[in-house]
Amino acid sequence: MKQERTRVVIVGAGPNGMTAAHYMGLYGIDCVVLELADGILPYPRAVGMDDEALRVLQGIGIAELAARDMISNVPLRYYNARGVCFAEVKPSTAHYGWPMRNIFMQQLLEGTLREQLVNYPCVELRQGHEMLELEQDADTVTLLVRDAQGEVYRLQADYVVGADGGRSSVRKQLGIELLGLTHPRKWVVVDTANDTLDAPYTALHADPQRPFVCIYLPYRQRRWEFMLLEGEDEAGMCEETTIRNLIRGHIGDAVDQLQIIRIRAYTHNSRVAARFVQGRVALVGDAAHISPPWAGQGLNSGLRDVANVVWKLAAIIQGRACASIFSSYDQERRGHATDLIALADNMGAVLGLTNPLMAGVRDWLFQAVNSVDNLRSHLLEFKFKPKATITKGLVYHERAQLHEDDLVGQLFVQPDIEDPLGQRRRLDEVLGRSYSILGYRVNPAEYLSEEMTAYWARWETQFIQINRSRSGAGRHQPLSAPGILSIEDVDNRLGEWFSNVRDCIVVVRPDRFVAAITTPERLDGVLRKLAEQLS
């Protein structure tokens, strides 16, 4: 039997698996991606992407390309049985450099990811290859794989990432249980083309007679989702005639122009794997956690998983960090993934009421919320979405008692800045692929001991001094600091961020989470604590 060896194997070539593969390529790590299917499924699946997920794609140079097939700043609206909008989510902020609500079609994103993989000769995508078995010891993971011609071979790797969806073969091979519940009501999902409906938003129609969803998609496509009521026959409800009659009730004869792409009944699950990491194998995306669609966070959670695990893999394989940091992925991601599933459950509960009395109470409550400015803003700006916050893991909290305003462990902001050449850029474009240490109006590199300077140089750490906008002697004489990168805070958003913390130096991880906040005098000691965590 043929035997091969690589550094990382990724099982599954969906958006999560391919994004992880791009990061492996970016870090120069040999990687094989195994995908059972021969090609990309030609219809939409995931359709919502947020600012955090786009920032992950930005890290591999894909965000701008993917955005060409997206509709940005799409509102989310709840309607009652009378067709009156009783709640709206319409964020106007861009804390992380991208719009918060974007509509896309998964097959187009997958196409972009696969097209751009040619930039990384160290990464190989193998379509039509099925993982049959997985075993691991202290040093190696061994996979038994069947190729597209039916030949079986062994593939060994240092690490494996299971990105193979809700029915994950990797998870099953590891014997990891998927904990949670399966929701009793099924939904019929209908993807259509040649759409002419003038409704450029995502509409959740909370009609107790039959809750349904209507999602505006790119390129004249639209998704409809209808709840199956108690006693209804699934097969009969999935017939095209039945579906056209349901849609006709909402758009009239315009339904005759629609092309039906796909009709499928779905059972929604709210489940989380008992472990995200076992030995040298990590589960990401739906392989680790499955969410109902109502918060639009399923794929976004998966991309957060990828961002968390890939830099750790790279650091271990390249000898910068000890292998024990691999397990921190579970510690840092499980809580937030679980919180977002709870959010989806709650949003689905608001939508799915079939008791008219309860639906009336809900409508009244939201009417009351909308009459209070602060509460209405809370809805509009999607402030009720749980923030990813790392309280334990590869971060260092100087305060013994954590506070709500502690920004350590949260995602760092991404405003526009000006580089030394006067070019306006997103912040991440100058942070690099590794750790970054930024000082607000101070040079952080001046406060490191020789030992810490040498240690963080091995990480290719980027040292940056942030200056107020136009604080130099002239347009061609920006303020600079010797030996480090100086940038200008052109929109004063970094100044605003630092005004909310006590200190003027921030340490940012490769995944753009804040590892520590400190003062120049304490910086060397803080970096020593972080180094201890890594090594």
Where are each of the predicted segments found?
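Helical substrate-recognition/capping region of FAD-dependent monooxygenase/halogenase enzymes
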Residues: 1-7, 11, 27, 83, ...
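N-terminal Rossmann-like FAD-binding beta1-loop-alpha1 element of flavoenzymes
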Residues: 6-33
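Active-site-adjacent segment of FAD-dependent monooxygenases/related oxidoreductases
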Residues: 42-45, 49-116
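Conserved FAD-binding catalytic core of PHBH/FMO-like flavoproteins
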Residues: 114-115, 138, 159, 163-268
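Internal hydrophobic alpha-helix adjacent to the cofactor/substrate pocket in enzyme cavities
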Residues: 303-323
